[in-house]
From Swiss-Prot:
Assigned keywords, A-Z: Fatty acid metabolism, Isomerase, Lipid degradation, Lipid metabolism, Lyase, Multifunctional enzyme, NAD, Oxidoreductase
Record-marked site positions (Important for catalytic activity): E119, E139
Chain residue ranges for the region called 3-hydroxyacyl-CoA dehydrogenase: 311-723
Keyword Transmembrane carried by entry: no
Task performed by this protein: Involved in the aerobic and anaerobic degradation of long-chain fatty acids via beta-oxidation cycle. Catalyzes the formation of 3-oxoacyl-CoA from enoyl-CoA via L-3-hydroxyacyl-CoA. It can also use D-3-hydroxyacyl-CoA and cis-3-enoyl-CoA as substrate.
Any single GO CC term annotated in Swiss-Prot or TrEMBL for this entry: fatty acid beta-oxidation multienzyme complex
InterPro entries: 3-OHacyl-CoA_DH_CS (IPR006180), 3-OHacyl-CoA_DH_NAD-bd (IPR006176), 3HC_DH_C (IPR006108), 6-PGluconate_DH-like_C_sf (IPR008927), ClpP/crotonase-like_dom_sf (IPR029045), Enoyl-CoA_hydra/iso (IPR001753), FA_oxidation_alpha_subunit (IPR050136), FadB (IPR012799)
Descriptive protein name: Fatty acid oxidation complex subunit alpha
GO BP: any one term: fatty acid beta-oxidation
Binding site for NAD(+): M325, D344, V401, V402, E403, K408, S430, N454
Taxon lineage: Bacteria, Pseudomonadati, Pseudomonadota, Gammaproteobacteria, Vibrionales
Family: In the N-terminal section; belongs to the enoyl-CoA hydratase/isomerase family. In the C-terminal section; belongs to the 3-hydroxyacyl-CoA dehydrogenase family.
Length: 723
């Protein structure tokens, strides 16, 4: 043994050939701070080893290295610029040490080789993988960019254009793709991987492969003419500006880093990369996006815990109510390996549900994500039925009939009589209280809400609603089933609108009040999309949700929270509803809609909306951008905080993920609680007080007032990790 540490070891495997194997005692290999320090010492031991002729990098896991340890990021990023720069210099010196070994080096890859793992293998002379290899640099998705030499080495290995595409898109390349662009030198069968790597390394040792020329190319300036350079970087900047936009600076910074470093040799180019990395690492966007990643891991951890605690795994499911929603739920369940009975009282609805499932499967087939055999198997695992026969075999029932309390109660009571005593029954409802629906059941402890979002196959969130009688076992089984479906389940307590709709409608309330006071809805949409970062402004979102749906939900919310959400008079939603302007579904709402060549609705402004709004709005008044953002966001933020204060949602992490996954809250802002930390709670309280005369929706919750007085934040404890 040449060197041994907890997460890696080095031994001589053949005459003069050493193998450095990453072998963490945990389930995956990560380049955490401790592993980097061990790698540094291992390379020192290799340099001192007599008779070294070549080095192989391997992993004892199915994935080579999944990346750096992201849980350490926020702690690192909280350091001063100088401390972070110093640490990056140390990290880069390790990879330089690997790259500068006086012998040829090869990385032997399988599974994920991502982020820091990819940057590590770029420092070796050659890379060989099997067909499971997935290699890339996803850092820009976290608001940062490669900081261990990825912006320097990748362009010199695969060319500037391909490197900018991989880095700016945060892409992981499949083995065949990586081979095509030169990121891998060879792809072989898994059982031949080790021997092929040894053979390749031996060829390099025997000078049949010019490893020194490869190394020289990686440590020299990029070979681009002035014209090539200008064309490459100008085009890349244009594409990135169009795709990433102003709220996500990391992709553009990566392009600038590659451009600035192109004319320098490795060490000077690394200095440039370091400078830009530090700037990104200190940004609010990086803090938010890394925070979201950590929150996502937290939610996945909770789901795993629930699955372990559940006494029974869901092997079969049933959906009551077909159509688009029922078909979408059935498709998602079947796709993830849980056969499903889809029951409806009408054959046309069953046909629609099966058509929806077939359409979604055909899309996957046309994109090469499944083959015909797999598609047929998935479709066959959805059983459409007009009867309850066979439903007794289901472990979980998802009721997805029309949003009407009487109809739902009748269906729930009926299905309960057809299933076993330990069958879990859920209701896919967006507004009807779970405690109300539970009254129709003999076993309310086996019942909870399971709120899917439309379109089911695309929306990652499922809101799991706990009623006052719901048992922990029921929650655990439903959370485990949602996770099995590939969804992110968030458990909330029952209240009008649950969490998502409860916090959305004060936002719509702020919108209605702005219109009442003379604001232009097209300007509000523009500001909330371009400046704040929502995917859709409130008027457009209402059109997509459906004005009739929003009108109904608004009445439910007003009844549930009369003090904050009760209305003094008619508003814009009432006016559009009364004029039968329901939005996209009938071609006319705040905007008018036509169907484009791809069959998608295209919105345009039409003056016919103006007389409809005239009697609920005062004369036109211009509001500045900041006022619009504040008047729109304060009611939502207050309601989110009240939900935490009242225990409707358990943690800031779960609330923020729900907002991002369920409502499209701008990821670069990280959710309401991350946003409050970023703005400063005391600053938010002072700002909100300026609008207190607008009514109860603008009154700051006591929790925020108390936290502001104590100088507290919601995510203070997440700033961990040390250099």
């Amino acid at each position: 043994m040449i060197y041994q540490a907890e997460t890696l070891q080095v031994k001589e495997v053949q005459d003069g050939i050493a193998e450095l194997s990453f072998c963490s005692p945990k389930s995956v290999n990560k380049l955490d701070l401790a592993t980097l320090e061990s790698l540094d010492k291992a390379l020192d031991a290799l340099k001192a080893h007599q008779g070294l002729k070549g080095l192989m990098l391997t992993s004892d896991k199915d994935a080579f290295i999944v990346g750096a340890d992201i849980t350490e990021f926020l702690g690192l990023f909280a350091k001063t610029d100088a401390e972070l720069d110093q640490w990056l210099q140390f990290a880069n010196s390790i990879f330089n040490k690997l790259e500068d070994l006086p012998v040829p080096t090869i990385s032997v890859l399988k599974g994920h080789t991502l982020g820091g793992g990819c940057e590590c293998v770029l420092a070796t002379d050659m890379r060989i993988g099997d067909k499971t290899t997935s290699i890339g640099l996803p850092e820009t998705k976290l608001g940062i960019m490669p900081g261990f030499g990825g912006c320097v080495r990748l362009p010199r290995v695969i060319g500037a254009d391909s490197a900018m595409e991989v880095i700016t898109q945060g892409k992981a390349c499949r083995a065949d793709e990586a081979l095509k662009i030169g990121l891998l030198d060879a792809v072989v069968d898994s059982d031949a991987l080790y021997e092929s790597a040894l053979k390749t390394l031996t060829s390099a040792i025997n000078e049949k492969l010019d490893w020194q020329a490869r190394r020289k190319q990686k440590t020299s300036p990029l070979t681009l003419s002035k014209l090539e350079s200008m064309m490459s970087f100008t085009m890349a900047k244009g594409l990135v500006a169009q795709k990433a936009g102003p709220h996500y600076p990391a992709p553009m910074t990566a392009v600038i880093t590659i451009e600035e470093g192109a004319r320098f040799a490795r060490n000077e180019a690394l200095d440039i990369e370091r400078k830009h990395f530090v700037k990104l690492a200190k940004s609010e966007e990086a803090k938010s996006l890394v925070g979201l990643f950590l929150n996502d891991q937290y939610i996945k951890g909770l789901a795993k815990k629930s699955a372990k605690s559940a006494s029974k795994d869901t092997q079969r499911a049933a959906v009551l109510g077909a159509g688009i929603m029922g078909g979408g739920i059935a498709y998602q369940s079947a796709l993830k390996g849980v056969p499903v009975l889809m029951k409806d009282i009408a054959q046309p609805s069953l046909d629609l549900g099966m058509t929806e499932a077939s359409k979604l499967l055909n899309k996957r087939l046309s994109r090469g994500r499944i083959d015909g055999f797999k598609m047929a198997g998935i479709l066959a695992s959805i059983t459409p039925s007009l009867h309850y026969t066979g439903i007794e075999e289901s472990d979980v029932i998802v009721e997805a009939v029309v949003e009407n309390p009487k109809v739902k109660a009748a269906v729930l009571s009926e299905v309960e009589s057809h299933v076993g005593e330990d069958t879990v029954i859920t209701s896919n409802t967006s507004t009807i209280p779970i405690n109300l629906l539970a009254k129709s059941l003999k076993r309310p402890e086996n019942f909870c809400g399971m709120h899917f979002f439309n379109p089911v196959h695309r929306m990652p969130l499922v809101e799991i609603i706990r009623g006052e009688h719901t048992s922990d076992e029921t929650i655990n089984r439903v959370v485990a089933y949602a996770a099995k479906m590939g969804k992110s389940p968030i458990v909330v307590n029952d209240c009008p609108g649950f969490f998502v709709n409860r916090v959305l409608f004060p936002y719509f309330g702020g919108f209605s009040m702005l219109l009442r006071d003379g604001a232009d809805f097209t300007k509000i949409d523009k500001i909330m999309e371009r400046k704040f970062g929502w995917p859709m402004g409130p008027a457009y979102l209402l059109d997509v949700v459906g004005i009739d749906t929003a009108h109904h939900a608004q009445a439910v919310m007003a009844q549930g929270f009369p003090e904050r959400m009760g209305k003094q008079g008619r508003d814009a939603i009432d006016a559009l509803f009364e004029a039968s302007k329901y939005g996209q579904k009938n071609g006319s709402g705040f905007y008018s809609y036509t169907i484009d060549r791809k069959g998608k609705p295209k919105k345009t402004f039409s003056e016919e909306i103006l007389p409809v709004l005239a009697d609920v709005c005062t004369d036109k008044q211009d509001f500045d951008d900041q006022t619009i953002i504040q008047r729109m966001m304060i009611p939502m933020i207050n309601e989110v905080v009240l939900c935490l204060q009242e225990g409707i949602i358990a943690t800031p992490q779960e609330a923020d993920m729900t907002l991002v996954y369920g409502l499209g809250f701008p990821p670069f802002r990280g959710g309401v609680f991350r946003y409050l930390d970023s703005v400063g709670i005391a600053e938010f309280v002072a700002m909100a007080k300026q609008y207190s005369e607008l009514g109860a929706m603008y009154q700051v919750p006591q929790m925020l007032i108390d936290m502001a007085a104590k100088g507290e934040s919601f995510y203070g404890a997440q700033q961990q990790g040390s250099i």
